[in-house]
Amino acid sequence: MIMEKIRFITDSASDMNHPREDVTILPLHIRFGDDEYADGVTISHREFYEKLIECDTLPTTSLVSPTVFEDAYEQAVSAGETVIVITISGKLSGTCQSARIAAEDYEGKVFVIDSMNATIGERILVEYGLQLKDQGKSAEEIVSILEKEKSKIHTMGLLDTLEYLKKGGRISSTVAFIGGALAIKPVVAVSDGEIIMLGKARGSKNGSNFLIREIEKADGVDFSRPFCLGYTGLSDELLQKYIHDSEDLWKDYAKELPISTLGATIGTHVGPGAVAVAFFEH
C-alpha cells in the first residue's frame, strides 16, 4: 500500500518556528511607511520589534495572495502530495479567502481550514495536524478531526501596555492615559475567530492571576495535544515571570515548555511585553 504524502501549508501569522520538511510557511507582508517586508523572511521578529518601538505610526500587514497559494499548491501537487492548508482566522485577514480561491482548481487535492484563530492558537492546530499525520491518519481524516477540534483551542494573552491599542484606534487617548496611570493590564482572547477583551487587571500580578483563572475555567491544559506559550517584544522576562506565577498549571508537563515569540500579526496591535498561551481544553 502506498503511503499518502501529505503537506501542510500555513501562513506566517501562525508564528511557527523550526518547521518540519512537510510544512510550508507563506509570509504575510508588513509595511512600515514605504518599506515592505516579508514576515519572517526579510524581517525577523527581533527586527520587527526594534522598528515597532521606534515608529509613531503602526505598520500594516497584508494578506498572502491567491497567486502565492496557487504556486505552493502546484509545487506540492506536482510532487504527488495532498495539501492541508491552515490559515489565520478569516475574520482577521483575507488570507483564508485567498487560500480558498487558489484551491478551486485542486478539488480533492487541497483542503483549506480556517483556524478561526491566530498566532500560537493557529500554530497548535497545525502541530495537532502533524501529530495526527504521524499517527498514520489520512488527509481527509485529519481535516475532519481538525475541523471538529479547532473550537476546543483557547488562545489568551495579557498585555503590558495600552499604547498600541490607542495607536490602532481601538481605545481613546484618555482611556490609555488613565489605564497607564492605574497600571491597567488588559486580558484578551480569541473567540469565534475574533480578538475580544476578556477583562482588565490592575498590575502584572493581578493580570497573571486573571489569566490563570481563565485557564482553570477551561479545565486546564490538555498536555496530550500541542500547546504553546508566547511573548511579544525583545525579551521573554515577563513570560518567565508569568510561568513562575502559574507553575501549578505546568507541573504535570515533564518536558521543556514550548515557547514562541509572537510576530507582526499580533505584535502590531498589542505591542511588546505581552504574554500569551494557547492550548486545547480537556
Regions found by a protein language model. Name each.
Residues 36-105:
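Class I S-adenosyl-L-methionine
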Residues 7-9, 84:
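Conserved beta-strand elements of the Class I
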Residues 2-6, 13-35, 95-111, 117-127, ...:
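Mixed-charge interfacial surface used for oligomerization/domain docking
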